[in-house]
Amino acid sequence: MNLENVTYKDTTPFVPPITGGKVIKVYDGDTLTLATTLPFEGSPMYRFSVRTKGIDCPEMKTKNANEKHCAKLARDMIKSKCLNKIVELRNVELEKYGRILADIYVDGVDVKTFLLDANLAVAYDGGTKVTPEDWLVYYNLKNA
């Protein structure tokens, strides 16, 4: 196959061959940015936005005050656990919108467990989202 004849259906999405890196930014509870190199000699230091596989957190960009409050709690929890730390990525793939999706481990612990245990995330498999009617009520079930 040459480039002149290639079509979209002849290609596969590129999944960066990354297995970990240093967390340099936390956007929200389930999205962070890593600094890492690719596995070839002389690779520059790249940054990748990575979404945590298997969960959905409250959204930062919402008009709902309770959801935004819980989104900030989730973000701050992940910042405290992960920011400026080296993390390991497992099961790296692309999700339906082309973003990197992975299981993210810090100090041997899957970071999604912190959020699920605190009711700051719900399980999510990429299909239809089922989220709490009120994130703050859901959070307070375990944290009141």
Language-model regions: role of each:
Residues 1-144:
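Small beta-barrel nucleic-acid-binding modules, primarily SNase/OB-fold domains
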